[in-house]
Amino acid sequence: MEMEEVIAEVLQKIVPTEEERAFVKELIGELEGIAREKAQELGLEVKPYFVGSLAKDTYLAGDHDVDLFLAFPLDTPLEEVRERGLELGKEIGKTLGEYEIAYAEHPYVRAKYRDVKVDLVPCYDVRDWKDVRTAVDRSILHTKWVNENLNGKNNEVRLLKRFLKGIKAYGSEIYVRGFSGYLSEILVIKYGSFVEVLEKADFILRQKVVDPAGWLKREPEIAMKTVRREVEEDKPLVVIDPVDPRRNVAANLSWEKYGRFYFKADEFLQRPSLEFFFPTGKTGGDYLAELRRKGTHLITLLFDVPEMVDDLLFPQLERSARGFEKALSREGFEVLGWNTGRYGAEKAFVMLELDRVERPRVKIHPGPEFFTERGRDFYRKNERVWLVGKRLYAEKRVKENIIDVVRELLEKNQVALGKNLRETVKGAEILVDYVPRPLENEAYLFLSREKEGLKH
């Protein structure tokens, strides 16, 4: 297919219909009315703001998640914003029907209304970046800036978002580390169109710094401080927030996700296809056959997790997986990859691909110099001891089975784990070359590299 044909067909699928737009407009009107009514009942001077893709008209067809921010006056103490904001969110949630409390920088309410997810988030009613008190305050400014600068390129943003979703590079959550919706909007505003953003994938990376609002001229000291900080942390991009020179919009973007965009952008420009937007790749397969093909082994730990949102859980799962990777490497096992996720509502898993599940019965254990106190202690404690020069060496018996090795590492606290997972991981069920049926496809996608691979 020609590129124009591909884009036209994608737009048919992702641009909301008039009927859908009417539903969204009605939904927003109802929610705003409820929010104002409840704020008035509680005697709160709060302004409701709709932010995010719905408020900017950059949402994809069928994606109606609502972000409703409850903005308090700037002179309100932070603790009051948290407490009264949560109280207001609960009252709105009760009216909507069902809700739960979620936690980020401060608690907020997640509700559901007419089959649409609604986040009710307390914030400050900020006018510019100098007013920002909490991380969420900027969202009001983001929505205003995009609406003032998008100039009818809404569908170009939709194309970029759908493309990024299709290549698994969309979402700024800490467990995704991809492109946020706001970053997508900025790139389209800066470079003109979906195709032009793709054409500049290499240029953007080499340029490194994107400054759409000209902060480097307006606030050079603050903006340069942001640039230096992000460059020192080896971030792929520094996109100075158009509404706040202190912030890098691409701060959560990983090298891996930009790398996916880098290659897939070029592939699409060379060979346009719907597959980039709506992939039909494998969703599962035979993980045991994959293990036989590779000659490797799969270790899976299943454990209970405390109740927490994914934004908090997934970084801790990742930290735990990296902890196992380092600890097992020290023990002589080669960890070829790891994978984490939820398993049902109350459990999580860590998968580790290893070169083997057994190791030699003995290991050469280097000791201290023989004429030291530690040397004499080493000589007393070990059976087979010899000298190489002035240094002592011994044969040390080691655990052979991977399960025993993992258990011992956990018992001795030699694995760096997520802070809320330390106790539960110690009681994990450890499976070797086997996973429960609900995780079979997940195991296959991990082992085959279908999940994160660039080429298969």
From Swiss-Prot:
Extract the InterPro entries matched here.
CAA_C, CCA-adding_arc, CCA_tRNA_nucleotrans_2, NT_2-5OAS_ClassI-CCAase, NT_sf, NuclTrfase_I-like_C, Polymerase_NTP_transf_dom, tRNA_NucTransf2
Listed A to Z, the keywords are: ATP-binding, Magnesium, Metal-binding, Nucleotide-binding, Nucleotidyltransferase, RNA repair, RNA-binding, Transferase, tRNA processing
Residues bound to CTP: S53, K56, H142, K161, Y170
Top EC category? transferase
Q: Which Pfam families match?
A: CAA_C (PF21133), NTP_transf_2 (PF01909), tRNA_NucTransf2 (PF09249)
Q: What is this protein's gene name?
A: cca
Organism in which the protein naturally occurs: Thermococcus kodakarensis (strain ATCC BAA-918 / JCM 12380 / KOD1) (Pyrococcus kodakaraensis (strain KOD1))
Q: Where is the signal peptide?
A: none
Cystine pairs annotated here are: none
What this protein is called in its record is CCA-adding enzyme
Report quaternary structure and partners.
Homodimer.
> For Mg(2+), which residues are the binding ones?
D65, D67, D119
Q: Name one GO biological process term.
A: RNA repair
Described function: Catalyzes the addition and repair of the essential 3'-terminal CCA sequence in tRNAs without using a nucleic acid template. Adds these three nucleotides in the order of C, C, and A to the tRNA nucleotide-73, using CTP and ATP as substrates and producing inorganic pyrophosphate. tRNA 3'-terminal CCA addition is required both for tRNA processing and repair. Also involved in tRNA surveillance by mediating tandem CCA addition to generate a CCACCA at the 3' terminus of unstable tRNAs. While stable tRNAs receive only 3'-terminal CCA, unstable tRNAs are marked with CCACCA and rapidly degraded.
HAMAP family, A to Z: CCA_arch
Identify the cofactor(s).
Mg(2+)
